[in-house]
Structure formats: C-alpha cells, structure tokens
Amino acid sequence: FSWTKNVHLPEGKFYGSAIYASKVNLTPSTPIYNEDGTYASGYRENNGYNPILEAEVNDYYARTVRAMGTAKIAYNVWDNLKVSSVFTVDYSLTKDFFFQSPDGRDGATYQGRGRMQMTDRIRYTSQNNLTYSKTFGKHSVSAVTAFEVMKYDYEDLYAAKKTYGQDINTSLGNAADPIDADQKLQEDALMS
C-alpha cells in the first residue's frame, strides 16, 4: 500500500509556462519584487510573468493511492495431482489538480481557473494450474494444464471551471462557470 502527494510546478506541459520561460528569458538583474515588497511585473522579458508570483499563487498537486496484493492456494488432490491458484489485485487512484489564481498571469484571463482529473484503475489476475507428475524408475511423466484470467477496469473523470470569487478557495465548487467535463470508461478482459 502506498499514498503519495506531489506538489509541483507546471513544468514540461506548456512551452509558455511562466516557470519554463523564465529560465530562458529572465536575467539575474530582472527584479522579482518592487521596492514596496509587492511582486514586480510589466518588464519586457517573459511578457511580464513573474515566476515567484506564479509559483506562490497557483496550486498544482497530484495524489496517488496504490494497493497491490497476491494470494496463493495449492491443494494436493492425489499423490501426483496438484491444483494451484494465484490471485493478484493491483489498484490505483490518482487525483491531479491545478489551480491558476486570478492574481497570476495565467489565471487572470479567466478570473481564476481550476482543473481536476481523477483516474481509477484496477487489474485482477487469476492463474490456475492442474499439474500431474509421476516417476517410474528412471522415467518421468508430467502434464500441466493451465489458464489465466485478467480483467482491467479504467475510469477517467475530468472537470474544469473558471471565474473564482474574491475569497479564493481553490475547490472547483467555488468557481462559477464550467469550462469542460468529460468521462472515459474502459474495460478489458482476457482469458488464455
């Protein structure tokens, strides 16, 4: 069993992200803060994006819960005949959330924008064997019959909203206008 939470910046997703573009465009002499302590903006480099402001007012995180388990049972039917079965489960639930604050450049156009994506995956596998093995002096006879069953379920749920109120609660329920919502379901099964 594992549970993780990653807090991250939107690196690697958009070329125009403030953090990525800052690596390329801003110089060490570009001010991050104004003399009064507020965040500086309006400079020509990087279209006025301030990477420290964006990192502070925006919220990006991913949570993952994962559980895996295996059980095995074996039974000797007769002296030379054995039945065995192995059952495994692999389950994961991932929730990705990002919030672009109306105080930052990315969220200002939307008066704040939030997106959440939840992905639910579960895989079951069952391996079943019937084994016969007999030795006659210097000779042996063995036979195995087996089958495996696998089932995989996948569900992805996505929603995005915009127009957050003055009291910033980053929950999607606090935004007024839906942007998009989608759901994807997939089921696969295999027997061999």
Annotate each language-model stretch with its function.
Residues 75-81, 134-137:
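Outer-membrane beta-barrel strand-turn architecture
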Residues 1-66, 86-191:
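Surface-exposed loop/interface segments of Gram-negative outer-membrane beta-barrel transport/assembly proteins
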